[in-house]
C-alpha cells in the first residue's frame, strides 16, 4: 500500500479558524454535489438495480464513524438469518485501486484494502473491491449472493439501493456543520433524513446513555455499543480474556479515525495504556513498533491485518464487537423479508 494514512483537520471538530482556501472551496464543492444529486433524483442520470436487495452503509461525514464494525455485524446477522450476503467496497488505500478483485481472509492488504480484508477475515463472506460499486454488486450476485451490502456507498448513487443505513459518530456528530473542505460533511446534514436507519456509534459510552425509541417506520437513532473482552495473540495462539491484562501496562496502537476511543476502551478495562496513534489507514512497518520497552502491544483488528507479515508473540489484536438493540434487527430483517418476497429472491 502506497498511502501513508489520513489525518482529520482539527478545525472540523473544534473552534479553531478555518483556513481561507477551505472556506472558499466549500461552496464550490456544495454546488457540485447538489447538482450531481439532482441529476440522479430527476432521472437525468440513471440508477441501476441488481436483482437482490441492496443495503448501503455509509455516512454524510468524511472519515471513520464505525461503519466497518456495523458492516461485520450486518453480515453475521444476515448469515444467521439464512441469507448469503456479499460486500461491495472500494477498498480504500490499496495499491491498484483501478483493479477489481475478490478479497479473502489471506489477501494482502496492499491488494484488498484493510477494511475489506478485515470483513472477509471476520465473516467468511464474499467481498468484492471495485471503484465501480455497481460492477461489484453485479459480480456478487453472479457469485451466488442473495443480498448485497455496499460499504461506504451512501454517495454512490449509480447503484440503486433498498435500505440506507447512516452511521454517526456519537461524540463528534457532524462537527462544525460545514461541507468539505471547510468541515467534515460530504453532503449537507439534511441528507441523513432520507436514510432508512441511523446508527449512532456511542462506543462504550452507550452503556449509560438513555435509549432512543425509533418510530414505526424504523427510522431513529439506534444506538450501537462497541465492546471488547478478549485479546488474540498474533502468533497464532489461542485467544485470551482481556481481563488478564488488567493492572498491567501495554503499548496500544491504533491507526483508525479516532484512536482515543480505542485507548479509552482499554483504560476502562483497567489496563495501563501507553498510546501510539497513527493516521487512519496507516501502512505499518516493523520499525513502527520500536517503542523502547518490551511490553505487550495491543491493536485494533483493522491494524492487525496489516501487521501479519511481521507479527510476533508480543503483538495482540483486540476483537471489537458491535452490539445493537434486538428491535433494530427485527425491524431491518422484517423490511428485508418483505423486499425479498416482492423481488422473488
Curated annotation (Swiss-Prot):
EC number of the protein: 2.7.1.130
Molecular function (Gene Ontology), one example: ATP binding
Domain of life, source organism: Bacteria
Keywords: ATP-binding, Kinase, Lipid A biosynthesis, Lipid biosynthesis, Lipid metabolism, Nucleotide-binding, Transferase
Binding of ATP, residues: 61-68
Example of a GO biological process term: lipid A biosynthetic process
Pathway named in the protein's UniProt entry: Glycolipid biosynthesis; lipid IV(A) biosynthesis; lipid IV(A) from (3R)-3-hydroxytetradecanoyl-[acyl-carrier-protein] and UDP-N-acetyl-alpha-D-glucosamine: step 6/6
Keyword flag Mitochondrion: no
Family: Belongs to the LpxK family.
Free-text function comment from the UniProt entry: Transfers the gamma-phosphate of ATP to the 4'-position of a tetraacyldisaccharide 1-phosphate intermediate (termed DS-1-P) to form tetraacyldisaccharide 1,4'-bis-phosphate (lipid IVA).
Protein name from the UniProt record: Tetraacyldisaccharide 4'-kinase
Organism the protein comes from: Xanthomonas euvesicatoria pv. vesicatoria (strain 85-10) (Xanthomonas campestris pv. vesicatoria)
Amino acid at each position: 500500500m502506497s498511502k501513508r494514512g489520513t489525518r482529520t483537520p482539527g478545525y472540523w471538530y473544534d473552534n479553531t479558524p478555518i483556513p481561507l482556501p477551505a472556506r472558499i472551496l466549500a461552496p464550490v464543492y456544495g454546488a457540485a454535489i447538489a447538482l450531481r444529486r439532482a441529476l440522479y433524483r430527476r432521472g437525468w442520470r440513471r440508477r441501476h438495480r441488481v436483482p437482490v436487495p441492496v443495503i448501503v452503509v455509509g455516512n454524510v461525514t468524511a472519515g471513520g464513524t464505525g461503519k466497518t464494525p456495523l458492516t461485520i455485524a450486518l453480515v453475521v446477522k444476515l448469515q444467521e438469518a439464512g441469507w448469503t450476503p456479499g460486500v461491495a467496497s472500494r477498498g480504500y488505500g490499496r495499491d491498484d485501486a483501478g483493479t477489481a478483485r475478490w478479497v479473502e481472509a489471506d489477501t494482502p492488504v496492499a491488494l484488498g484494502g484493510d477494511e475489506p480484508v478485515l470483513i472477509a477475515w471476520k465473516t467468511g463472506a464474499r467481498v468484492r473491491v471495485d471503484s465501480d460499486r455497481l460492477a461489484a454488486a453485479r459480480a456478487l450476485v453472479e457469485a451466488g449472493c442473495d443480498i448485497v451490502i455496499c460499504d461506504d456507498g451512501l454517495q454512490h448513487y449509480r447503484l440503486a439501493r433498498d435500505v440506507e443505513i447512516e452511521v454517526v459518530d456519537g461524540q463528534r456528530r457532524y462537527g462544525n456543520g460545514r461541507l468539505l473542505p471547510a468541515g467534515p460533511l460530504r453532503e449537507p446534514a439534511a441528507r441523513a433524513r432520507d436514510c432508512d436507519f441511523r446508527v449512532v456509534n456511542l462506543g462504550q459510552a452507550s452503556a449509560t446513555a438513555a435509549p432512543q425509541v425509533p418510530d414505526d417506520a424504523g427510522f431513529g437513532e439506534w444506538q450501537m455499543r462497541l465492546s471488547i473482552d478478549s485479546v488474540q495473540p498474533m502468533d497464532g495462539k489461542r485467544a485470551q480474556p482481556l481481563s488478564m491484562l488488567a493492572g498491567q501496562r501495554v503499548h496500544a496502537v491504533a491507526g483508525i479515525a479516532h484512536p482515543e476511543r480505542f485507548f479509552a476502551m482499554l483504560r476502562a478495562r483497567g489496563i495501563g495504556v501507553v498510546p501510539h496513534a497513527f493516521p487512519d489507514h496507516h501502512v505499518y512497518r516493523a520499525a513502527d513498533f520500536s517503542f523502547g520497552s518490551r511490553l505487550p502491544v495491543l491493536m485494533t483488528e483493522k491494524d492487525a491485518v496489516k501487521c501479519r507479515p511481521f507479527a510476533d508473540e508480543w503483538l495482540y489484536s483486540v476483537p471489537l464487537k458491535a452490539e445493537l438493540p434486538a428491535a433494530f434487527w427485527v425491524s431491518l430483517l422484517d423490511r428485508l423479508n418483505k423486499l425479498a418476497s416482492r423481488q422473488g429472491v
